[in-house]
A protein has these predicted regions:
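Bacterial N-terminal signal peptides
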Residues: 9-17
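N-terminal leader/linker segments that initiate helical-solenoid repeat arrays
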Residues: 18-53, 57-59, 63-68, 77
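Helix-start (N-cap) detector for alpha-helical repeat units in TPR-like alpha-solenoids
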Residues: 28-30, 63-64, 98-99, 132-133, ...
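Terminal, low-structured helical/coil segments at or just beyond the last alpha-helical repeat
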Residues: 30, 306, 311-348
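Residue-level recognition of tetratricopeptide repeat
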Residues: 37, 71, 106, 140, ...
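Structural signature of tandem alpha-helical TPR/SEL1-like repeats
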Residues: 41-54, 75-89, 110-123, 144-157, ...
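Structural marker of alpha-solenoid helical repeat scaffolds
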Residues: 58, 93, 127, 161, ...
């Protein structure tokens, strides 16, 4: 799963920073901190950084200001090294600052330091065991590192805390499906689409699992829901077209393949299947054009030459062009015995 790392601002109750004679300095530092917080919410990152540096200048032992400054550096200015330093300073001043450990872990992820990221996220969870964002980030980290067992465990822990966590439901369902645990995956994804009926990826994954199980009616409905939720979902349109073609629903299938190539003009397989459908519809000119486009896109696609050869042989009754096309199919590694026999007999 491929998610963008986003640093989050923790809601921190500052209270009374200092007592007695230093209260005015504390108030001044807090004023700049609150000003920085407001500027962050407005997207004014340069101004926010300046306000927070003033707060720290007035009150050097101000962990919340360092933490927010780290967020500004990371999110607003992409100064990741400076962000990491700010989070480390916040942690130095407040070793129980779970949010600072969490955001430091996210910075390490962006910097490509997975070991360090894991350490910081675990520290955040040691302080705050029910820290959902940290648990989710840790699960994603494990998944990116292909540590599927650890990822499954982390996602399961998160769902135990929050059963309606949509990202975790999808991620764990995806992992289970990749491990061949189809029923467990289906259960999670079904829960997800009940919570969010327009979750296109969940519908699509349910469709692919149903298709693998040869439950084509179920797969068809899932793909239809996927494209309804996301009309530009290329693979869902393609898979739906393939199922409709297998059912003999030629015009709806052709429409799905046309939509596919409109969305992704270099989708050779979609052009090839569109050619098959056109041939079955006796739209021979359109079929030939679709096959030729397939070969233009994928000149070494043996299956495209096979289908074009069949088209010439059976639909156009053009044995000469069929033979030329079949020869190219065999040159590219095709192994169909009937085609091999035809080409062999001509040579003799």
């Amino acid at each position: 799963m491929r998610s963008r790392v986003v640093l989050t601002i923790a809601v921190v109750a500052l209270g009374i920073l200092l007592a007695g004679g230093a209260s005015s300095a504390a108030d001044e530092a807090k004023k700049y901190y609150n000003q920085g917080m407001q500027q962050v919410s407005q997207g004014k990152y340069e101004a926010a950084a300046e306000s927070l540096r003033k707060a720290i200048e007035i009150r050097p032992k101000f962990p919340e200001a360092y933490h927010l400054l780290g967020i500004v550096y990371a999110n607003g200015q992409r100064r990741l090294s400076d962000a990491a330093d700010a989070f480390k300073k916040a942690i130095e001043l407040n070793p129980s600052f779970a949010e600072a450990f969490y955001n430091l872990g996210l910075v390490y992820q962006v910097q490509g330091k997975p070991v360090e990221a894991e350490q910081e996220l675990k520290k955040a969870l040691a302080i705050h065991p029910k820290y959902e964002e940290a648990l989710f980030a840790l699960a994603q980290l494990y998944e990116r590192q292909q540590a599927s067992g650890s990822a499954v465990e982390a996602y399961a822990q998160l769902l135990a805390l929050r059963p309606d966590h949509q990202e975790a439901l999808y991620a764990l369902g995806y992992l289970y499906e990749s491990q061949g645990k189809s029923q467990e995956a289906k259960d999670l994804l079904t829960r997800l689409v009940k919570l969010r009926t327009d979750h296109a990826d969940a519908h699509y994954l349910l469709g692919t699992m149903a298709e693998k199980a040869n439950s084509l009616a179920e797969a068809e409905q899932a793909y239809k829901k996927a494209v309804a939720a996301r009309p530009d979902f290329v693979d869902a349109h393609y898979n739906l077209g393939f199922i409709l073609k297998s059912k003999g629903e030629l015009e709806p299938a052709a429409q799905e393949f046309r939509t596919t190539v409109k969305l992704k003009p270099d989708y050779a397989e979609a052009y090839m299947n569109l050619g098959v459908v056109y041939a079955l519809q006796h739209k021979f000119s359109e079929a030939e054009q679709a096959y030729e486009e397939t070969i233009r896109l994928r000149p070494k696609m043996a299956e495209a030459y096979y289908n074009l050869g069949v088209f010439y042989e059976f639909h156009m009754r053009d044995t000469t062009r069929a033979l030329v096309t079949y020869k190219k199919y065999l040159e590219l590694g095709g192994t169909d015995e009937r085609v091999q026999r035809i080409v062999r007999e001509v040579k003799q």
